[in-house]
């Protein structure tokens, strides 16, 4: 029997542990459900297919042209119908650099799409962590308000008893009733905020809104302060910066692509023709073949080439400027993220100390009121101070947890908790 009880206890503990959801598990489920990541992955696949399509420009092409005609007037000795079928195989030898530019552009587009997909993973991961910590904060805030309501109710019982015994005036009873009404209103708001946070939590991972949630991690857990990352390493790790750098290279290739149509073009091919003899007197057909070379040399287009290439170079310059702007943005983002992280860590320590003091003050005030040496106003003021500092602590812990997640997103580093 003892073994059976131990087995049941172990099973219950196992089921309870399995029901809890860790931050890593939630982040994984959000990424698996994310429509944004699915779209980015589809865009990467599209870009990969475009690379294969661009490379077909190096290969010969096979095409055929056909026609059929029927004359309305009858010519003596000549049949009224006629047809022609002309297959051709053409190999482009030189397209002015257009084919190589198209392949290079497609390859860079594929790399850019992969970078965009990686950057979207950072954003989705941060959104998951932000939502997780928000729900944790709303849980703690709801618990603190419930505790606050319990404290006021216990004080109300004491006040009502002392009023019934004639030790205090009616004003004290009215004050505690008013404070209880305010606390119940705060409880209603806290429950609403928790419900909204839970709905957002479930929507982000694609489950039913009524699904109950039990978090295995909390903002009150000890989250280590991450080490600051060297800025050069931050830039080297950012997928969006890599994409912007690739965009500069793509713009350089686009200059060559813009120039290509104005360069000489050379292609060779072999073709055939199946058609009736001309004139078509007997309806008999013949098959003939030919080898050919096609050359196109643009000569004068009123400065069109110069303007097209100049416009492409301006777009290249814009890409370079955008890269420099992104560099400054990442620098600002990293500096502000680190300052916010350090400040929020200090705020957690300060708020924890203040909350301990407020808790001791509440105990002393309640004890003094029970002994008749303090007024109910002193107790109510201590309760308000305790709730405010408790809320400040929750806010500070939430801000710190979010700041850690944000800094890891900024530096493109995986979460370590």
Question: Across the structure, where does each feature detected by a protein language model lie?
Answer:
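Short, charged, amphipathic alpha-helical segments
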Residues: 107, 170-179, 310, 376-384
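Bacterial Sec-dependent N-terminal signal peptides
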Residues: 1-24
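Periplasmic alpha-helical coiled-coil/stalk elements that build and connect Gram-negative outer-membrane
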Residues: 120-235, 337-340, 344, 386, ...
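Hydrophobic, lipid-facing positions within transmembrane beta-strands of outer-membrane proteins
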Residues: 83-89, 289-295
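Small/polar (Gly/Ser/Thr/Ala-rich) solvent-exposed segments
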Residues: 38, 61-80, 92-121, 242, ...
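Bacterial Sec-pathway N-terminal export signals of envelope proteins
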Residues: 19-63, 92, 169, 209-252, ...
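Amphipathic alpha-helical coiled-coil segments
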Residues: 39-54, 120, 124-143, 161, ...
